Structures are given as structure tokens and as C-alpha cells.
Amino acid sequence: EVECLPGPTAFVPALVSSGLPSDRFSFEGFLPVKKGRTKRLKELSTETKTMVFYESPHRILKTLNDLSNYFEVESQISVSRELTKLYEETFRGTIKESVEHFEKNKTKGEFVIVLSPK
């Protein structure tokens, strides 16, 4: 088990604890909410390196569903919330499993998604 100490950004502990390849990655931040979202997802769908996204609790399920439409559903993903806080939680699995998990488990907090498209 890896424990990463907090720093100034949430994506670094999420990336390290994800267990996904971190030798090459891109930080994508928040995906566009409306305008440009589909275009950005299409652009990212050909990416081969690990990608890191931020997402709000109100859009987490939509974003996971969108990712499942543009990437292989068996792609590995890690979804972390409330990093370094009392209710810290990380889900690891496939995109498909993450959609199923978050359909059943409504959670609060800000999320960091780490996606390995390979």
C-alpha cells in the first residue's frame, strides 16, 4: 500500500496512489461543461498516456459515462475524492465498473479521475 503525503495539488497524490502508469501523463483539469466537451473528448480519445481530470460531485457520473463512450470500457481508472480528509476514498477498476459503482454510491466531495487508456 502506498501512502502519499499531501502537497499543493490534489492530482499528485491521486496519480501516485492510483497505481496507474505515471511515467507519462497529462493533467487535463476540468473538462468543458457544455461547449467544446464532445470535441475535447474526441481529441483525448486517441491519447495513449495517463490522463488526470478534476470533476465536481454533480457531474462525476456524467463524466464517467462520457469517458466510457470515448475510451475502451475496460480501460483502467482511479477515482479519488476528499483526498487527505477524513472521508477520503479511492475507487480503482475499469471505466465500466466505475460507472456501476457511482450509480449505486452517491457521494459528495471534489473528485480526481486518473485514466489509463491502454
Describe the function of each predicted region.
Residues 1-47:
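Class I SAM-dependent methyltransferase SAM-binding "motif I" and its flanking Rossmann-like core
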Residues 49-50, 54-118:
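A contiguous loop/helix-start segment that scaffolds small-molecule binding in enzyme catalytic cores
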